[in-house]
């Protein structure tokens, strides 16, 4: 799960905060 969060954070840096929220829900 930790690795997945890291990937979501990287995507968020590109401008996709929705992915971060989705990652937390998937966790």
Curated annotation (Swiss-Prot):
Keywords: Antimicrobial, Fungicide
One BP term from GO: defense response to fungus
Function: Has antifungal activity against B.cinera, F.oxysporum and P.piricola with IC(50) values of 15.2 uM, 12.4 uM and 18.1 uM, respectively. Lacks hemagglutinating activity towards rabbit erythrocytes. Lacks deoxyribonuclease, ribonuclease and protease inhibitory activities.
Name of the molecule in the record: Ganodermin
Species in which this protein is naturally found: Ganoderma lucidum (Ling zhi medicinal fungus)
């Amino acid at each position: 799960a930790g690795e997945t969060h890291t990937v979501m954070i990287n995507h968020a840096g590109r401008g996709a905060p929705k992915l971060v929220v989705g990652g937390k829900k998937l966790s």
